[in-house]
Design a protein with these regions (language model features):
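PRPP-associated nucleotide enzymes
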Residues: 1-178
């Protein structure tokens, strides 16, 4: 499938499944080395990161836990910039190495709020792992520890990312066709 139609928009393949798998495996290898002996807990940001987080966990070679938090800042194809926590964190993070697993970092506002909320839980350290990063959209100063793909400022769907709730099941990543 080179192109797909979701609702009123058309999308074309931009990152094939094989390339995603290769990058996720490479990221997991690096993270496994970095996190050896650190008792990490991954916090996947729902809904977009659930496929990435699952694939990443399966490739890890060190013991780690995973939990999920739900935040929202999107409406349609644009970020609202307003973040609201929907589902909180129940795990004790004190003294733990926390790895936030995100599908995409754009402005950085969601990530900044997440890091601030984690700070009150006294983690040993907080690292950020994102599947996609749009450097030209970044408004907040962030240290992204692990980035699978730096991409241009185009709207994408697939591999967990959606357009109004649709398209998450696509194995490839698709870019909107203007």
């Amino acid at each position: 499938m080179d192109t797909v139609k979701i609702k009123d928009k058309s999308f074309r393949v931009s990152i094939p499944e094989a390339e995603i798998k290769e990058r996720v495996k490479a990221l997991a290898e690096q993270m496994s080395k970095d996190l050896e002996g650190k008792n990490p807990i991954f916090l996947g940001v729902l809904n977009g990161s659930f496929i990435f987080a699952a694939d990443l966990m399966r490739e890890m070679t060190v013991p780690c836990e995973i939990s999920f938090v739900k935040l929202a800042s999107y409406q349609g194809t644009t970020s609202t910039g307003k973040v609201r926590e929907v589902l909180g964190i129940n795990e004790n993070l004190s003294g733990r190495t926390v790895v936030i697993v995100e599908d995409i970092v754009e402005s950085g506002q969601t990530m900044k709020q997440m890091i601030e909320s984690l700070g009150t839980r006294n983690p040993e350290s907080v690292r950020i792992c994102t599947l996609f990063f749009k450097p030209e959209k970044l408004k907040e100063e962030l240290n992204l520890d692990y980035v699978a793909f730096s991409i241009p400022d185009d709207f994408i769907v697939g591999y967990g990312l959606d357009y109004d709730g649709l398209g998450r099941e696509l194995k490839d990543v698709y870019t909107i066709v203007e």
